[in-house]
UniProtKB/Swiss-Prot annotation:
Lineage of the species this protein comes from: Bacteria, Bacillati, Actinomycetota, Actinomycetes, Streptosporangiales
Chief location category: cytoplasm
Record family assignment: Belongs to the endoribonuclease YbeY family.
Annotated Zn(2+) binding sites: 116, 120, 126
Superkingdom, natural source: Bacteria
Function: Single strand-specific metallo-endoribonuclease involved in late-stage 70S ribosome quality control and in maturation of the 3' terminus of the 16S rRNA.
Name the record gives this protein: Endoribonuclease YbeY
Keywords: Cytoplasm, Endonuclease, Hydrolase, Metal-binding, Nuclease, Ribosome biogenesis, rRNA processing, Zinc
Gene name of the encoded protein: ybeY
Ranges in coiled-coil conformation: none
Amino acid sequence: MSIDVANESGVPADEERLARLARYILDALRVHPLAELSVLLVDEEPMADLHVRWMNEPGPTDVLSFPMDELRPGAPGRTSEPGILGDVVICPQVAARQAERAGHSMQDEIDLLCTHGILHLLGYDHAEPDEHREMFSLQNELLAGWRRSLEEEER
């Protein structure tokens, strides 16, 4: 699995942890081992530019996903097709503000945003109430499993 993480923001970030998180999520969702994913951290100005260009919304946002191939999670016992999953773009400055409001660390918020972005790349959405329940339930389940795996590593 090819996971490329690049930090083009002015905010220090744990790129290795983000790559490990992405691998954890893709493995949990049985995405093909030859799939490719890019995670990019950018400052507010480039994120605002992307937000206007692709979503026609002003100002920076927390995370944007740009799917390439239309990959979906694998079925039980099978992986998905190989291909290029796409790009997840995260703005750490927006993440920091959201983390403060939510009462958790910026790293926890970036983990959440990365997970959320990957789920969008895999076809999940939250426009309708039933989609929202499904996506956020899976997101919470994946993040809980990720935190458990980190705790086990620390032992």
